[in-house]
Amino acid sequence: MTYNFEMPWPPSVGSCWRAYNNRFILSKKGRQYRVDAIAKLKELHLDGENRSERLSVSLVLNPPTLRKYDVDNFNKALFDALSHGEFWLDDEQVDRLVVTKGTKTKGGNIQIKVEVIQC
Protein backbone atom coordinates (compact mmCIF):
# COMPACT_ATOMS: atom_id res chain seq x y z
CA MET A 1 0.00 0.00 0.00
CA THR A 2 1.21 3.50 -0.84
CA TYR A 3 0.07 6.87 0.51
CA ASN A 4 0.80 10.20 -1.20
CA PHE A 5 -0.21 13.38 0.60
CA GLU A 6 0.90 16.87 1.58
CA MET A 7 1.39 18.26 5.08
CA PRO A 8 1.98 21.81 6.34
CA TRP A 9 5.53 23.12 6.70
CA PRO A 10 6.74 22.22 10.22
CA PRO A 11 8.82 24.25 12.63
CA SER A 12 12.48 23.25 12.89
CA VAL A 13 13.63 21.04 15.74
CA GLY A 14 15.26 24.06 17.40
CA SER A 15 12.03 26.06 17.55
CA CYS A 16 9.81 23.08 18.34
CA TRP A 17 11.30 22.09 21.70
CA ARG A 18 12.14 24.21 24.76
CA ALA A 19 14.12 23.43 27.91
CA TYR A 20 12.05 23.75 31.09
CA ASN A 21 13.10 22.58 34.57
CA ASN A 22 15.85 20.32 33.20
CA ARG A 23 13.58 18.64 30.65
CA PHE A 24 12.41 19.38 27.13
CA ILE A 25 8.81 20.31 26.39
CA LEU A 26 6.96 21.08 23.18
CA SER A 27 6.99 24.83 22.47
CA LYS A 28 3.88 26.86 21.62
CA LYS A 29 4.92 26.74 17.96
CA GLY A 30 5.36 22.96 18.21
CA ARG A 31 1.96 22.49 19.86
CA GLN A 32 0.27 24.60 17.17
CA TYR A 33 1.94 22.60 14.41
CA ARG A 34 0.72 19.37 15.99
CA VAL A 35 -2.86 20.72 16.03
CA ASP A 36 -2.60 21.90 12.40
CA ALA A 37 -1.03 18.63 11.21
CA ILE A 38 -3.65 16.47 12.93
CA ALA A 39 -6.39 18.65 11.40
CA LYS A 40 -4.80 18.09 7.98
CA LEU A 41 -4.73 14.31 8.56
CA LYS A 42 -8.43 14.43 9.47
CA GLU A 43 -9.17 16.47 6.34
CA LEU A 44 -7.38 13.82 4.27
CA HIS A 45 -9.17 11.01 6.17
CA LEU A 46 -5.79 9.59 7.20
CA ASP A 47 -6.17 9.97 10.97
CA GLY A 48 -6.72 6.71 12.78
CA GLU A 49 -4.97 4.62 10.09
CA ASN A 50 -2.63 3.26 12.78
CA ARG A 51 -0.31 1.60 10.28
CA SER A 52 1.72 -1.03 12.09
CA GLU A 53 3.93 -2.31 9.24
CA ARG A 54 7.54 -1.38 8.47
CA LEU A 55 7.57 1.72 6.28
CA SER A 56 9.55 3.55 3.62
CA VAL A 57 9.08 7.34 3.63
CA SER A 58 10.05 9.87 0.96
CA LEU A 59 9.77 13.58 1.72
CA VAL A 60 10.03 16.58 -0.59
CA LEU A 61 10.58 19.75 1.46
CA ASN A 62 9.04 22.82 -0.20
CA PRO A 63 10.06 25.71 2.08
CA PRO A 64 8.13 28.98 2.48
CA THR A 65 11.28 31.08 1.89
CA LEU A 66 14.60 30.86 0.07
CA ARG A 67 16.47 30.75 3.41
CA LYS A 68 19.06 27.98 3.68
CA TYR A 69 18.05 25.02 5.82
CA ASP A 70 19.21 21.55 6.84
CA VAL A 71 17.00 18.73 5.57
CA ASP A 72 17.20 16.89 8.89
CA ASN A 73 15.67 19.73 10.96
CA PHE A 74 12.05 19.18 9.93
CA ASN A 75 11.41 15.44 10.21
CA LYS A 76 10.90 15.28 13.98
CA ALA A 77 7.87 17.61 14.24
CA LEU A 78 6.28 16.00 11.18
CA PHE A 79 6.85 12.42 12.36
CA ASP A 80 5.62 13.20 15.89
CA ALA A 81 2.46 14.74 14.43
CA LEU A 82 1.89 11.65 12.26
CA SER A 83 2.21 9.53 15.40
CA HIS A 84 -0.14 11.72 17.46
CA GLY A 85 -2.61 11.84 14.57
CA GLU A 86 -2.53 8.04 14.55
CA PHE A 87 -1.41 7.70 10.94
CA TRP A 88 1.16 5.18 12.19
CA LEU A 89 1.84 3.73 15.62
CA ASP A 90 5.35 5.14 16.02
CA ASP A 91 8.00 6.71 13.82
CA GLU A 92 10.41 3.89 14.72
CA GLN A 93 8.54 1.91 12.03
CA VAL A 94 10.34 3.94 9.36
CA ASP A 95 13.13 1.75 7.99
CA ARG A 96 13.93 3.91 4.97
CA LEU A 97 13.85 7.71 4.75
CA VAL A 98 14.65 9.81 1.68
CA VAL A 99 14.54 13.60 2.05
CA THR A 100 14.78 15.90 -0.97
CA LYS A 101 14.85 19.70 -1.13
CA GLY A 102 12.03 20.99 -3.30
CA THR A 103 11.12 24.50 -4.43
CA LYS A 104 9.93 27.58 -2.57
CA THR A 105 6.15 27.37 -2.13
CA LYS A 106 3.80 29.93 -0.61
CA GLY A 107 3.31 28.88 3.02
CA GLY A 108 5.63 25.90 2.52
CA ASN A 109 4.64 22.24 2.62
CA ILE A 110 6.03 18.74 2.70
CA GLN A 111 5.02 16.21 0.08
CA ILE A 112 5.01 12.74 1.60
CA LYS A 113 5.07 9.29 0.09
CA VAL A 114 4.70 6.41 2.53
CA GLU A 115 5.05 2.84 1.32
CA VAL A 116 4.49 -0.32 3.29
CA ILE A 117 7.59 -2.50 3.07
CA GLN A 118 6.73 -6.05 2.05
CA CYS A 119 8.77 -8.58 4.01
Question: Residue locations for each model-derived region?
Answer:
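Acidic, proline/glycine-enriched N-terminal capping motif
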Residues: M1-C119
